[in-house]
Structures are given as C-alpha cells and as structure tokens.
C-alpha cells in the first residue's frame, strides 16, 4: 500500500465526518486536537461557535494576513464508493471543504514552525453552505480585535487540472439569495374546483411568470438567474391543494440587478394573490454578497502565480457561484481563487472526487506566496 501525505490523510479523516452549518462539532474537535498538538509558542487560539480563530504571531509584524477556510458539509448522500466515504448518512463533503481544511492545516503547520515577519490569522469558518457563517464571524468581538489587513481564500475547481490556479480582478462570484414563496388558498374536492382556490395551479402560473424576469427585466449585458428547484403542494390526487411552496435561488452579477429581480418577484407574487384570491409570503432566506477581488492585491497574486514553477495560471470569467466569503472581502481587501482538482463530477455532486495531489501542491504554492507577501 502506497503511503500518503499527512494532509491527504487529514482530508480523508475529515471527509468521513461532514456536518451541516453550525453543527460542525466533531469537525471543530478534530481541528482543535490537531492545532493544539502544534508548537504553541506563537499561536493564540480562540473558538467562535463551531468555528476557530488561530493567530500566528510574526517575528516583526507590520500587518496581519488572513487566511479563511470553510468547514461545513452538505445534505447530500455520498455515492463515491470510496473507503473513506461519509460516516454521517445523508451528509457529504461535496463542495471540497475537506480539501480546503487540509490545506489550511498544512499552512498553519508550516507557519507555526517557520514564522514570517507579519502576523497571520487562520479562520476556520462554519456554515458557508448556509445559513452563512462569514458575516457573523466578521462581526464577532474576536475579529474586531484580530481584523486582518488583507485576506485570501481558495475554492476547489473540479473542471481545472491539478496544478491550475484561476482567478481575476474584480467580480469573481455572484450575489446570491435563497427564495421561498408560500401560497395559501382554499382546498376542496377535485370535483368542485369552482368552490376552491387551487394553489398548485397558482404555483405553476407563478413559476412560468418568474422566467420572464431575467428575459425582460435584466440588462442583457448583465447576468441573472432565477431557478426554482423545488415545488411542493397538495396531499392526495383528488383534493385541491390549499397550500403550495416554491423553493429556489436568485443569482446576479450586480447588486442593482438583485434589487430589480426581487422587486419584480414581489410584483408578480402580488399579482398571483389578486388573480387567485390567495395569501402569499416571500422569504429570501440566506443572502450572500458578491465576491469582489481587490484589483491591486489580485494583480500582484496573479503575477506571482504566473511566475511560479509548476503552476498554470488561467484568468477566468466571473461565475454565478455563491460564496459568503464575499462579506469578508467587502470589509477587508483580498481575493479568492480557484484551485484545480480535476474531478469528472462537479461541485455539490454525490460523486465528487477531487484529485488529492492538489492538496500538497496547494500547500506548497501558498506557503511560498504567503511567505513572500508576509516578508515584503
């Protein structure tokens, strides 16, 4: 049996115990056990809910560099068939947060033993997949004291080969919002539709109307998506449904488009209420701020990546992906980038299988970048 690196082994350990947002208790304990086993001379450790802050004191600090990783899993039943598959039935690390954590621990291990001039702050953030941990973590008393001067994070990219790094200046990820619409009418016997207000029909009409928003209300040079991923309503085949619920997501590349889309949704729901004589409620659930990369820091990072041996850099396009790291970037200059992991299955897929060779390569690259940035 071939040996694997310690950080690949860590990734496999973490892959077995995916936990949902703000329920990452086993994950937090695993991380803390590892962190407490490192040399402690330069470390300061604080917990926040199920997250962790670790400050690495520099030798002659002039600034603080932040590095953030997310730690939660998804409510997806794993289908990889791997020997280290999820032991938590119905949950999976299907977005690569196990890879993200193992890379962060690799960096922390190095800098605990080989400090640089500047202070470092490692942020192990819960609930990225929902309901959102970045914003409350940013607003915490801990981060008011330990607020980095710059911050960075990565996300795995299944579509890129191992050895690839991709990013761009400015807008990288979209503004996102959940969407839940509840309709309440009047149920009744299927034989007497005139005596009821059918919420299945109302819901179907609303879904069709929503599709016109992107086509006719959003600037064609901008981009927006409204996806209804789930419709529920009714009880049995011969009873007219009193309730119906739509669940979906909104994604836009601009803040103005998000505002416009929500205005149009609200107008259409008001129309449905009148047309079908029903009640309706809209809940936008979790909302994530766009990921906007600081142009100066990102350009500098791109130049570093382009000159780093063994790395292929790609200047990518913006994506409709959502990431609550955008809240941190709205307050702290920094950037996010894609790290290629070459998987035939994409993010949030039950068969996502990142190439683990990306872990040690990502650690080596980021050690070099952070060392260079923190000593200059």
UniProtKB/Swiss-Prot annotation:
Q: What is its EC number?
A: 3.5.1.47
According to its UniProt record, in which pathway does this protein act?
A: Amino-acid biosynthesis; L-lysine biosynthesis via DAP pathway; LL-2,6-diaminopimelate from (S)-tetrahydrodipicolinate (acetylase route): step 3/3
Q: Where is the active site?
A: 70, 129 (proton acceptor)
Pfam families recorded: M20_dimer (PF07687), Peptidase_M20 (PF01546)
* Gene3D superfamilies in the record: 3.30.70.360, Zn peptidases
EC top class, in one word? hydrolase
Q: Which reaction does it catalyse?
A: N-acetyl-(2S,6S)-2,6-diaminopimelate + H2O = (2S,6S)-2,6-diaminopimelate + acetate
Name of this chain's protein: N-acetyldiaminopimelate deacetylase
């Amino acid at each position: 049996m071939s040996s694997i690196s310690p950080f690949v082994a860590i990734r496999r350990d973490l892959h077995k115990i995916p936990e949902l947002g703000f329920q990452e208790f086993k994950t937090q304990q695993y991380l803390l056990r590892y962190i407490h086993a490192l040399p402690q001379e330069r470390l300061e450790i604080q917990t926040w809910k199920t997250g962790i802050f670790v400050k690495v004191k520099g030798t002659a600090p002039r600034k603080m560099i932040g590095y953030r990783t997310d730690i939660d899993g998804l409510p997806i039943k794993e289908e990889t068939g791997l020997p280290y598959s999820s032991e938590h039935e119905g949950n999976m690390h299907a977005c690569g947060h196990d890879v993200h954590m193992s890379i962060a621990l690799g960096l922390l291990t190095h800098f605990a033993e080989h400090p640089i001039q500047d202070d470092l702050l490692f942020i192990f953030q819960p609930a990225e997949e929902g309901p959102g941990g970045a914003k409350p973590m940013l607003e915490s008393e801990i981060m008011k004291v330990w607020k980095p001067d710059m911050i960075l994070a990565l996300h795995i990219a299944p579509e890129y080969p191992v050895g690839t790094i991709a990013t761009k200046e400015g807008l990288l990820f979209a503004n996102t919002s959940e969407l839940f619409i509840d309709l309440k009418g009047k149920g009744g016997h299927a034989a007497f539709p005139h005596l009821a207000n059918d919420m299945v029909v109302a819901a179907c009409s609303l879904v069709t109307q929503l599709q016109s928003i992107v086509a006719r209300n959003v600037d064609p040079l901008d981009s927006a998506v409204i996806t209804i991923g789930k419709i529920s309503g009714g009880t049995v085949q011969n009873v007219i449904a009193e309730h119906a619920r739509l669940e979906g997501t909104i994604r836009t590349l601009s803040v103005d488009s998000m505002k416009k889309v929500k205005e149009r949704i609200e107008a259409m729901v008001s129309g449905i209420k009148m047309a079908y004589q029903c009640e309706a409620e809209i809940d936008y659930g979790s909302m994530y701020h766009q990921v906007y990369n600081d142009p100066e820091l990102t350009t500098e990072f791109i130049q570093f990546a382009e000159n780093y041996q063994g790395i292929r850099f790609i200047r990518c396009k913006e994506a409709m992906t959502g990431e609550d790291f955008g809240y941190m970037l709205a307050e702290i200059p920094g950037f996010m980038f894609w790290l290629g992991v070459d998987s035939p299955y994409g993010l949030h897929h039950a068969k996502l299988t990142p190439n683990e060779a990306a872990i040690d390569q990502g650690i080596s690259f980021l050690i070099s970048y952070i060392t260079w940035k923190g000593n200059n």
